[in-house]
Amino acid sequence: MSNENRTCSFCGKSKSHVKHLIEGENAFICDECVSNCIEILHEDGNDGTPSESAGGEPEESGKLPTPAEIVANLNDHVIGQEQAKKALAVSVYNHYKRLRHPKAGANVELSKSNILLIGPTGSGKTLLAQSLARKLDVPFVMADATTLTEAGYVGEDVEQIITKLLGKCDFDVEKAQRGIVYIDEIDKISRKGDNPSITRDVSGEGVQQALLKLIEGTVASVPPQGGRKHPNQEFINVDTTNILFICGGAFAGLEKVIRQRTEKGGIGFGASVHSKDENADITKLFGIVEPEDLIKFGLIPELIGRLPVIATLEELDEDALINILTEPKNALVKQYQALFGMENVELEFEEGALRSIARQAMERKTGARGLRSIVERCLLDTMYRLPDLQGLKKVVVGKAVIEEGREPELVFES
């Protein structure tokens, strides 16, 4: 093809009608079409550069999700806990904004916004942390504080948390250094009493001190591929300075510490008068928690200082538990309906059954965590027989199934 007859493969314009005509293999593109392509990519929030794969800095080549967008995503998975969601969203947004603009705070030292979640068992602490990491597309790992020990003791030392985090991103150090670590049951490693221990304990203050080093930022030496440490071995160095740590716990008994502080009262103008009702709302008390309360509970002051954002979660009531059963994308009722649907059987939960399930979970003090075991128990026999029940059209779970252990109603094709 002569130069004069060459045309853009996209718009059909000839070389004489455009400034530039770029030649490829058996194709041409003009400068105008290139400009249009760039505009389209910008409108899609992509500047044309390849984005980082899963587990890197959140949406590196695109827009960092705003706090409102993060909360909207959390609403799809977690019912209620609006204040906790806002606190988490703002802290996480500020954290990754700080990482994206390291030079912006050249004259100001921007601290890391590590988070402490306080709330009863089954209120959604773990699910919130998991959902956050999923939305931000960063490596995420969970650790149980009760299984951790100081280095040198039998058990899982705190540096193994970083080993697990590396494993989540195929030992990509850069990705791991921007990940999220959730440490559950942090309240279970509180030291006994207000005064520091004379001797270090394996599972209490000593573990807090070890965690403190990770949280405030240190270079952890991790064995390659997660193996055990041994002499003459090369280690992977991971800087934990920019890893976001979220700690959670039920803090049973903390309300007594807060009540003791607030009920001291006084005489004169400005003195607070507080009720000594033992049935005072624990959620409201958690909402006014102060660092001094956490110190009295048994957390060391240095650790509390590294967890500047404190978010409290409410105990879930009956209506909230019913919503958890039916509303989120991963709602239990929807999950079981999908399983039954695979056998071409409709599954229905009556309102009375849902309320009974929620009531039993509240009585067990297990919150949302206890819902699955209750539903599983009432459907176990039916699911066992389901593949062999020819002509079954519908299964109805009523109140009596939950409260009296009766079989669900089976509706067959007529």
UniProtKB/Swiss-Prot annotation:
SUPFAM superfamilies: Glucocorticoid receptor-like (DNA-binding domain), P-loop containing nucleoside triphosphate hydrolases. ATP binds at P120, T121, G122, S123, G124, K125, T126, L127. Zn(2+) binds at C8, C11, C30, C33. InterPro entries: AAA+_ATPase, ATP-dep_Clp_protease_ClpX, ATPase_AAA_core, Clp_ATPase_C, Clp_protease_ATP-bd_su_ClpX, ClpX_bact, P-loop_NTPase, Znf_CppX_C4. Keywords: ATP-binding, Chaperone, Metal-binding, Nucleotide-binding, Zinc. PROSITE patterns: CLPX_ZB. Pfam families: AAA_2, ClpB_D2-small, zf-C4_ClpX. Component of the ClpX-ClpP complex. Forms a hexameric ring that, in the presence of ATP, binds to fourteen ClpP subunits assembled into a disk-like structure with a central cavity, resembling the structure of eukaryotic proteasomes. Belongs to the ClpX chaperone family. GO terms for biological process: cell division; proteolysis involved in protein catabolic process. Residues 1-49 form the ClpX-type ZB domain. This is ATP-dependent Clp protease ATP-binding subunit ClpX. GO terms for cellular component: HslUV protease complex. The keyword NADP does not apply. The lineage of its organism: Bacteria, Pseudomonadati, Pseudomonadota, Betaproteobacteria, Neisseriales.
